[in-house]
Amino acid sequence: MIFDRETFFDSVRTSLFGGAMAQPQVDGMEAILAAWEHYLEPLGWDRRWLSYALATTYHETAQEMQPIEEYGKGAGQPYGEVDEETGQTYYGRGFVQLTWRDNYARADRELEFSGDERLEWHADNALKPDVAARVMFRGMSQAWFRPPHNFEHYFNVTTEDPYGAREIINGDKHIVPEWSNGVSIGNLIKGYYTKFLTAVNESAREELASEEKEELASEEKVVEIQITIRITARGPVTIEVVPNA
């Protein structure tokens, strides 16, 4: 499964971004879609998980759709202090906030980062959109952020609970922000989810297998031929068809 970008972005541009998007917003969503297509779609993950991850990103980044650093960079928290061994500070980074050294190291193990890719030793790598997307998907599926809450608990064959799913990231679903016109955080994200799910479903396209692509390509070939007609006085007319090289 792949997603037609024109269809997807046309949908969310209207429903979520007031008719216009900045390039960083497009780039952030592109990173999320690309990570899904490359790493997760082959595993048969539920598209509702993708839609909820996009909705969470929309909320957590204040619609910027780019990985962000935790406000205050962990000031007053143990994880806001520089680690003596690595020289890194493990405050929150990403589309959703990855915090604490143990979690940065866990991301390295789970996602098989090595060398200069390692988040434990290069914490700002968590701000790269492709890395942030993979951390978000793995963390939300495996309950890294608020155990035991994960995608599968809220989106499965019998359940679709985008309101309750806020528990995956934060227990603030009942809180009503001053700017929200009386709508709770859980219901705000539920609304974003519904719009992202529409865009995801509208843009989903089955990707052809390589042999099917070759077959279609061969059917579309135009074959040029050379026709030679030989006419003799007493014999039959003969026609020789020779395909051009």
PLM feature spans:
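Metal- and O2-centered redox machinery and metal/ROS homeostasis
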Residues: 44
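Acidic helix/loop microenvironments that form the catalytic cleft of cell-wall polysaccharide enzymes
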Residues: 57-60, 150-177
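GST-like fold's C-terminal all-alpha helical module
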Residues: 133-157, 161
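A short acidic/glycine-rich loop-to-helix N-cap element
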Residues: 175-192
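Protruding loop/beta-arch "assembly-hinge" segments enriched in small, turn-prone residues
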Residues: 190-200
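Intrinsically disordered, low-complexity segments used as extracellular stalks/linkers
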Residues: 206-207, 211-215, 219-221
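Short, low-complexity, charged amphipathic interaction modules
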Residues: 217-245
